[in-house]
Amino acid sequence: MNPIDTDDLEKHTPMMRQYLTMKAEHHDMLLFYRMGDFYELFYDDAKRASELLGISLTARGKSGGDPIPMAGIPYHAVEGYLAKLVQIGQSVAICEQIGDPATSKGPVERKVVRIVTPGTLTDEALLQERQDNLLAAVYQGKVGFGYATLDVSSGRFVIAELETKESLEAELQRTNPVEILYSEDFDAMELLHHFKGKRRRPEWEFDYDTSIKLLLAQFGTKDLHGFGITDARLSLQAAGCLMQYVKDTQRTALPHINAITRFNQTDTIVLDAATRRNLELTQNLSGGRDNTLAAVLDNTATAMGSRMLQRWIHQPLRDHAQIFARQTAVNELLETTAHESLHEQLKALGDIERIMARLALRTARPRDFARLRQALNLLPQLQQSLAQLSAPHTVKLGQLLGEFPEEQQLLERAIVDNPPMLIRDGGVIREGYNAELDEWRGLSEGATDYLVQLEAREKERTGIATLKVGYNRVHGYYIEVSRLQSQQVPLNYQRRQTLKNMERYITPELKEYEEKVLSSQGKALALEKQLWDELFDLILPKLHELQAFARAAAELDVLSNFAERAETLGYTCPELSSEIGVKIEAGRHPVVERVSQTPFIANPVTLHNQRRMLIVTGPNMGGKSTYMRQVALITLMAHIGCFVSADRAIIGPIDRIFTRIGASDDLASGRSTFMVEMTETANILHNATAQSLVLMDEIGRGTSTYDGLSLAWSAAEYLAQQIGAMTLFATHYFELTQLPELMAGVYNVHLDAIEHEDTIAFMHAVQEGAASKSYGLQVASLAGVPARVIKAAKHKLHQLESRDHQVEGVNVNGTRAPIQTLLALPEPVENPAVSKLKAINPDNLTPKQALDLLYELKRLS
């Protein structure tokens, strides 16, 4: 959005001058300007809002001689419109009337009281319940990047020092922020192109000294040594920018942001961006959540548990001790069936994590307090359930849950059973909590009895049987008489309102009572709001302990969920080994087995020091990619403490999981399919180690046969002999099945199929040894390729096979050609011009000789 020109404000009306001044301060976001019961937008904001929200674009008179484009939304519907805007990455400044229209001379005083951006949301109605809502900042140094994320809705603050663009891309994929701040000199914009909420920030917001001061002030510490982050210079600069941005948008204290942690890649199995994408961990290739690992594993009782599970999936642990602690807890929950009762108890807790953030920001609503009260009421019952368990990790979590009897009793006394949505209309504070409030309410609530008595008395006094006493918000209390009987009213009746068939009156007595009641209502509401504000002060001293309660409850939820998933889906506890290797018996793809219409065929895999690479061959559609992915997913599941989809699994140390599976053009970066494939392959060859699990699928298919085969052969050879990584290498180049004859530790496996006449049945079973053919024409027929095309293809295949030469390494008789023959390309012949140039000594040439030589080289080339 273009900045607003405020140089010539005098030509505008006073109200538009006020609007333009505020808009100039928030030029990069939509300004919702409160006017009565509507939020209005003007000029470019109105046009943009009309386009984004589908609301009418009109005009509001003129200002400065020009019509003013205008659009508006009702104030009571604002949350729905805000939700739409933040989902597309749009930020909004909300400007409210804070002055009294009755006493204002000129425009009513207004102020921006709230700024809503995608990454700073805390309102329950605007947040995705089961997804973290991360605000991120990235700062580029001379070498490497600083990266910081903050979840304002929970207070979780994390930084990471990243050496390369590839590691930054992986972090962006892992964290998936909804809003990103980046410095002016950031030059890797191709990594951010698909993020909707991008904000360019001035360089000074990333200043190191300023960042340190901001963080120290936020945490209330003298230094950052206690957080173990003093050497993370670049990410601290990013964190400082984040902190300033959140302070600017929230405009209040942020006590729930009380710590910062550093994400160390050495603590977790490294997953690059391609691997996270290809394995469809929490997001499928279409951008949704269906048919992902998270969708299968997530039956958590709480939203905060669901969010923690997704973080675990993206951060598989390397430390076997931590994994074993989780496994032991899950195993005990499963054996004792305690997960069943825990699930029901946890379900009633609600999203305490986000409730505590709203409490800290003082934006909590009455129902947040009611949910917190319910959670604290359930806590003793939860503690009692955990007291029956002895797994060390479960015991530790039980201790972290804490005890809050005073806060529970306070909320029980203070908040009604079913509070309204908002505090503004009262009715939140329970009767008996405050004597003065009860007194004012008594005056107000006694009005009904008084009016009934007054009506009866006046009917008797005046003899008017149709006389009624009533009330409305506009005219207050009144005595209503039909027009025909209005001649009978006493002299002390003062006409207040004339209707078609009725006259309404007020008496001095009724007027006095009205003032008394309205005064008591106003005083009751003011006192109730004061007591409401005091509740925050009484609860917030326990903020940190309540946050720890939320984290412990979320982790209990994940562990209980793992136990339930193991029982329901038939998972087993994997064994952790100190020896390098992966051994899986009857492994199943955890996602495919859930969506498959037919029984899933379980398959084994064995990788160890003497069997480091499997060359996987078989027909297209035979299940090679599914087989490889299931090995990676089972390995990952084992490292988050989850039981796995196999009869048995023994997993050794893993430092990284790489996948090179499938490819498509990267249009945003201008990279072809083959370029994407080679970039991912290069990343694997540069970074894989002997403890890495590598999945390579169809390397080289994006180029010519000889180029592709050469690259696939060389990549496999390098992985097997130079790196020694545990590798599954699927290929359609049958020549690669000769690798086991040439290299130690390389073995062939294949997925079987049975051919009958022109049909094919995929067995999906992994067998030792190489496949015999790929069944390409049969698969094409199954895919619906017209019969005429299939017939022509068979004819062409027969012609090619009949020629006296080898096609893709296959002899005329159908046997494989020696790979040495296939790769024995003719030595290149050097160009005569190059030979001539190499023989020249330029120091011995005269200018005339140099010119003659130039013409000679031109002729030779």
UniProtKB/Swiss-Prot annotation:
> SUPFAM superfamilies from the entry?
DNA repair protein MutS, domain I, DNA repair protein MutS, domain II, DNA repair protein MutS, domain III, P-loop containing nucleoside triphosphate hydrolases
Any Gene Ontology CC annotation: cytosol
The UniProt record lists the keyword Transferase: no
Q: Pfam families, per this entry?
A: MutS_I, MutS_II, MutS_III, MutS_IV, MutS_V
Provide the residue positions that the database annotates as binding ATP.
Answer: 618-625
Give the matching CDD domains: ABC_MutS1
Record bears the keyword Nucleotide-binding: yes
Q: What would be an example GO MF term here?
A: damaged DNA binding
Q: Which GO terms describe its biological process?
A: mismatch repair
Keywords, alphabetical: ATP-binding, DNA damage, DNA repair, DNA-binding, Nucleotide-binding
Please give the NCBIfam families that the UniProt record associates with this protein.
Answer: mutS1, PRK05399.1
Family affiliation: Belongs to the DNA mismatch repair MutS family.
HAMAP family assigned to the protein according to its UniProt record, in alphabetical order = MutS (MF_00096)
What is known about what this protein does? This protein is involved in the repair of mismatches in DNA. It is possible that it carries out the mismatch recognition step. This protein has a weak ATPase activity.
Q: What is this protein called?
A: DNA mismatch repair protein MutS
Give the organism's phylogenetic lineage: Bacteria, Pseudomonadati, Pseudomonadota, Gammaproteobacteria, Alteromonadales
